[in-house]
């Protein structure tokens, strides 16, 4: 196969990872970000596009001559897959590269909440501990993960590893299968309403699809125990964020979120105005992005391109 022209449309979403490895395939161009009206010009003459969030739709595929679409993520909702198949354009995503990173961030956020890390760090950094008459401070109660009922929504690869870690902490793990097809012998399977009613902690690790969109709304949040913790490390759009903000302030619900329906977060978002700020941890979609995970991601994109070349050798 001839040398390829490869274009990366949103390199900023990959951070400080070195992309020079793609030069070995031919000509490589990289753009920090790409607006919708810049896609056509930048992809003219390109054989391969690397995209994380930039949409590759029918219009792009009709006006450009792409042979391969490399998605620098697991989710594929930014590409019109049916039309790509019709146009005989190969589409490759990357799965499994960020499992350890997401699991680690899940528990980093959860433990920060359970152990009131924000409160106690602020207490010390503000100089209040210096003024104390005793060696400790118990103003914000902390609690253990051991013995808690830990519900997982979406028991895929990440969900299973979260279950394993939660079990190691001594939590009692159960799960709800969003597809309805998962029957795991190691953990108790519950229907969604029962899981929400019973669990002290509920952790979402599901994709966004027709079965999970708006899965957790006001009704579902009201089923949860007062003071329970809801975590979303799956996709925005699964949880009604306005209803969650209300539940945090009115029912003492606590939450750890790494994904929102609109990203970046919108100005005036109800979660920015909650009164119980120590009950809420929000990170900007970083769970996937350890340095190790991003290095693995690039290596797997390279492998996808190499496999494509082998499959089309002689064409």
Predicted features along the sequence, with ranges:
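N-terminal glycine-/charge-rich "phosphate-binding" loop or analogous flexible N-terminal tail
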Residues: 1-48
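Short beta->alpha connector loops at strand-helix junctions that form conserved
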Residues: 32, 72-73, 89-100, 177
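Short glycine-/small-residue-rich Rossmann-like dinucleotide-binding loops
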Residues: 54, 74, 200, 206-208, ...
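Rossmann-fold NAD(P) dinucleotide-binding segment
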Residues: 55-66, 83, 211-230
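Phosphate-binding beta-alpha-beta segment of Rossmann-like dinucleotide-binding domains, i.e.
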Residues: 89, 95-149
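Rossmann-like dinucleotide/phosphate-binding beta-alpha-beta segment
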Residues: 136-226
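Rossmann-like dinucleotide-binding domain for NAD(H)/NADP(H)
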Residues: 227-229, 233-315
């Amino acid at each position: 196969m001839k040398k390829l022209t490869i274009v990366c449309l949103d390199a900023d979403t990959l951070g400080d990872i070195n992309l020079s490895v793609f030069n070995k395939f031919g000509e490589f161009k990289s753009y920090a970000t790409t607006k919708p009206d810049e896609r056509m010009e930048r992809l003219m003459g390109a054989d391969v596009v690397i995209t994380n969030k930039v949409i590759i739709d029918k219009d792009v595929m009709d006006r450009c001559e792409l042979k391969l679409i490399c998605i620098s993520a697991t989710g594929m909702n930014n590409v019109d897959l049916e039309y790509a198949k019709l146009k005989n354009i190969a589409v490759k995503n990357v799965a499994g590269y960020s499992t350890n990173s997401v699991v680690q961030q899940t528990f980093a956020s959860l433990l920060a909440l359970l152990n009131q890390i924000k409160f106690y760090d602020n207490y010390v950094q503000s100089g209040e501990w210096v003024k104390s008459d005793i060696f400790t401070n118990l103003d914000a109660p902390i609690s253990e993960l051991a013995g808690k009922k830990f519900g997982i929504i979406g028991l895929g690869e990440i969900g299973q590893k979260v279950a394993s870690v939660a079990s190691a902490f001594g939590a009692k793990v159960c799960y709800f299968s969003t597809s309805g097809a998962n029957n795991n012998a190691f953990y108790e399977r519950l229907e969604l309403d029962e899981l929400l009613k019973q669990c002290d902690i509920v952790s979402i690790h599901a994709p966004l699809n027709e079965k999970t969109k708006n899965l957790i709304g006001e009704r579902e949040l009201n089923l949860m125990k007062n003071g329970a913790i809801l975590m979303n490390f799956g996709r925005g759009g699964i949880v009604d964020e306005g209803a969650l903000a209300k539940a945090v302030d009115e029912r003492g619900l606590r939450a750890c979120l790494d994904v929102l329906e609109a990203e970046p977060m919108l100005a005036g978002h109800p979660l920015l105005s909650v009164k119980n700020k120590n009950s809420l941890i929000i990170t900007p979609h970083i769970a996937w992005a350890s340095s190790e995970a991003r290095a693995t991601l690039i290596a797997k994109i390279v492998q996808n391109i190499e496999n494509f070349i082998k499959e089309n050798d002689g064409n």
